[in-house]
């Protein structure tokens, strides 16, 4: 599966619908260079009446079916397309992250075709996986931390030297 094809399609529809969500999980980590895999694409979004309407429009436009597994406990909306097994999960909250706004403030816009998606920072992905504590999340932590260290080193190398007062 080339996730880039799906992410371009999703970014296009988000733009058409003015739907805002932050890409999280292994898909977000892979975009930042982590050698991880996933069978789904996860987003964190605000659970508002208008966003629920937008999710329904997104599902219709992309030929997806909306499921709400474990409702009301999970507050997660799963959108699936049978023809190619695309699975997109929209979470209302995730472990380790206090608010959507805080996650969004640290996210980076990434281009997919001529549209952009917000992608969670590697620090937030690591924090969430550690807080979730599930074996599948803990299994990738060392890999994610190694990639994050490389990201930090690149950012430090790009940062200008602070001016020294004389």
What name fits each language-model region?
Residues 1-166:
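Compositionally biased terminal segments of proteins
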């Amino acid at each position: 599966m080339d996730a880039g094809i799906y992410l371009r399609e999703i970014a296009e529809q988000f733009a058409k619908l003015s739907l805002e969500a932050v890409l999280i999980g292994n898909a977000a980590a892979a975009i930042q260079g982590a050698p991880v895999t996933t069978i789904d694409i996860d987003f964190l979004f605000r659970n508002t009446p208008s966003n629920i309407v937008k999710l329904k429009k997104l599902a219709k436009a992309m030929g997806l079916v909306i499921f709400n597994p474990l409702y009301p406990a999970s507050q997660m909306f799963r959108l699936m397309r049978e023809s190619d097994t695309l699975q997109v999960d929209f979470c209302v909250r995730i472990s380790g992250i206090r608010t959507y706004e805080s996650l969004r403030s640290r996210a980076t816009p990434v281009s997919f075709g001529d549209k952009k998606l917000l992608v969670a920072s590697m620090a937030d992905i690591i924090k969430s996986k550690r807080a979730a504590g599930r074996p599948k999340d803990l299994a990738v932590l060392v890999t994610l931390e190694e990639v994050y260290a490389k990201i930090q080193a690149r950012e430090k190398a790009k940062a200008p030297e602070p001016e020294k007062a004389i």
